[in-house]
Design a protein with these regions (language model features):
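Single conserved hydrophobic/aromatic residue that forms the stacking wall/gate
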Residues: 1-14
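C-terminal functional module detector
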Residues: 12, 19, 40, 44, ...
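Divalent metal-dependent hydrolysis catalytic cores, especially in the metallo-beta-lactamase
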Residues: 13-43
């Protein structure tokens, strides 16, 4: 009877899940230390033929004499966030927002991003207390489909309204972007990235469609940033300079923060060593909207 009870307890325990995080060495951001690092590296090379996966041969890498965990994990970013524009905080309202695709994603920060398209937008919507309400009334939001304008006397070219607010606990915003994808007359898929609003009242270059450098820098020794660069909010109205009303296309918004230290750099600083040389030392956290599709018919 005692053995039976013990067996049942083991079965129940095995069905439960636990969650833990790896150490900096296991994440691959700092090297293994001492003889354990050398043993791990050469043992992995010696027995790599036992692993059928190509990734098995790269589980550990040697850089400047130091042994790091390899594989794809060190190149990954940290966890992101899913954001929903729902009318209220209820299961039904949130589900409806998912159904109409009025959702966006971030790489981790709590950035707020709005994206609309329509034919009757004007500059007053950027500052009016009813601006977002008017955008819903006269256009479509992220995740929606914009049809060709058939109203006589109005422009065939849609206007896009984009607003973003920074996470107050993170870096300021650097730029707003719109990414356009389309299929040309020959059936080829195309894509182009437009900078549409720049921090610190800088102007987008009309030829390159890029914001100038706003001077944001990161001190790799301490991960300190210069908070006087960047903006807490960015907002603009934008029209596609190459818009073709006959082409099917999609547009989505993206907002980038000023550069900050990547998680692997933070690990290295806390360990009192230099960051791993083959990984990016900084990252620009960001948010992406769901796309708005244009149907030219």
């Amino acid at each position: 009877l005692i053995g039976l009870v013990g067996s049942e307890m083991c079965i129940r325990d095995r069905s439960k899940l636990g969650i833990l995080s790896s150490t900096a060495m296991q994440r691959g951001s700092v090297p293994y230390t001492g003889l354990s690092g050398q043993f791990t590296y050469y043992a992995n090379r010696l027995f790599s033929f036992l692993r059928p996966s190509p990734l098995g041969k790269n589980l550990f890498v040697k850089l400047n004499g130091a042994v790091y965990s390899g594989g794809p994990n060190p190149t990954f970013g940290a966890s992101g966030l899913a954001a929903v524009w729902a009318e209220e905080n209820t299961r039904e309202s949130i589900f409806n927002a998912f159904s109409r695709k009025e959702v966006f994603a971030t790489s981790g920060p709590r950035i707020r991003l709005r994206f609309f398209a329509g034919y009757n937008f004007d500059e007053s919507m950027l500052t009016s207390v009813n601006g977002i309400e008017n955008a819903y009334s006269h256009g479509v939001s992220m995740g929606g489909t914009l049809l060709k304008n058939k109203s006589e006397g109005e422009s065939d070219t849609p206007t896009f309204l984009i607003t973003a607010s920074a996470d107050p606990e993170n870096a300021p915003l650097q730029r707003l972007q719109v990414i356009k994808g389309w299929v040309d007359k020959n059936g080829n898929t195309k894509e182009f990235v437009y900078d549409v609003a720049c921090a610190n009242n800088l102007e987008v270059n009309v030829e390159t469609h890029r914001c100038p450098d706003n001077g944001a820098r990161v001190d790799i020794e301490s991960c300190a940033i210069n908070p006087e660069t960047g903006s807490a909010q960015l907002a603009t109205l934008w029209t596609d300079p190459t818009f073709n009303p006959q082409e099917r296309s999609f547009y989505y918004a993206r907002v980038l923060e000023n550069p900050t230290c990547r998680w692997s750099t933070w690990d290295a600083i806390r360990a009192g060593i230099q960051p791993r040389p083959d990984l990016s030392k900084t990252i620009q956290e960001r948010a992406w909207s769901s796309p708005i599709h244009y149907v030219g018919q």
